[in-house]
């Protein structure tokens, strides 16, 4: 009987520590509901690197120079307004069960379909992008009353099989993804500016969402490392870049 009690306590402590580790590892990447699902189903989690098809978003602020000039030497003011912007955009990623990968200056990277499965990852990525643009409109109306210049946004969305998992050094690692598909998502975001659109969508993403969202062809672009050009499109409601 005593052995059974010890075994029970040991199992309880082990499960508790596992849940705490999952919360520590993914609490800043995922919504609370997603973290709880992982805690209840730790077998769904593959912490080693694995190949998975993901839908990846990169975002970047447009008009940052005007915003920075508005604040001048008020570094605290600039930091606060950027944090407000990032908070509003991140909320949409987490609400749609995306994984927030990282902030890169005033840019964001997020993806869908890892660590938990998401059969509609491409649709959720595009839905999130549209909601982010909607939130941007509301945010700009709010800060306009404070005399802040409007924020613009460029987004790139790509779907591809990439490597995802814990990556880094023995001192620090992050749950992230890498591969040509990730690089292309970043390049697509960069194409939003010269093509004067808010959102640029890659070919595989378009294949998955074409029955839900109407997209417009933009061009066939050359991409370093690829022999054939990449057909890029934009969602119909984002044909004009918000500056």
Please provide the spans of the model-predicted regions.
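Regulatory cytosolic signal-relay segments
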Residues: 5-52, 66-69, 73-76, 80
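Helical mechanochemical/support elements of P-loop NTPase systems and associated helical scaffolds
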Residues: 22, 34, 78-81, 85, ...
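Catalytic NTP-binding/metal-coordinating core of nucleotidyl cyclase/transferase enzymes
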Residues: 45-127, 175
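A structural signal for short, well-ordered beta-strand segments
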Residues: 56, 108, 153-159, 232
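Alpha-helical scaffold within the catalytic cores of cyclic-nucleotide enzymes
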Residues: 81-98, 114-155, 159, 180-193, ...
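Cytosolic regulatory/linker segments at or just downstream of nucleotide-handling modules
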Residues: 162, 191-235, 239, 243
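Cytochrome P450 core scaffold surrounding the K-helix E-X-X-R motif
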Residues: 166-169
């Amino acid at each position: 009987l005593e052995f059974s009690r010890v075994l029970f306590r040991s199992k309880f402590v082990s499960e508790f520590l596992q849940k705490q580790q999952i919360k520590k590892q993914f609490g800043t990447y995922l919504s609370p509901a997603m973290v709880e699902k992982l805690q209840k189903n730790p077998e769904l989690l593959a912490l080693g690197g694995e190949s998975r098809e993901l839908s990846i978003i990169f975002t970047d602020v447009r008009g940052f120079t005007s915003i920075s000039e508005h604040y001048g030497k008020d570094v605290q003011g600039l930091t606060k307004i950027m944090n407000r912007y990032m908070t509003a955009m991140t909320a949409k990623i987490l609400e749609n069960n995306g994984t927030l990968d990282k902030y890169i200056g005033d840019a964001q990277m997020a993806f869908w379909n890892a660590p938990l499965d998401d059969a509609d990852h491409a649709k959720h990525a595009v839905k999130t992008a549209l909601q982010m643009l909607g939130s941007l409109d509301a945010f700009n109306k709010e800060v306009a009353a404070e005399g802040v210049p409007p924020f613009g946004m460029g987004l790139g969305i790509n779907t591809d099989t990439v490597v995802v998992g814990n990556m880094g050094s023995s001192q620090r690692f992050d749950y992230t993804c890498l591969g040509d598909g990730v690089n292309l998502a970043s390049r697509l975001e960069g194409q939003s500016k010269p093509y004067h659109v808010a959102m640029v969508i890659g070919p595989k993403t378009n294949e998955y969402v074409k029955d839900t969202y109407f997209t417009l062809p933009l061009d066939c672009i050359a991409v370093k490392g690829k022999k054939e050009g990449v057909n890029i499109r934009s969602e119909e409601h984002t044909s004009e870049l918000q500056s």
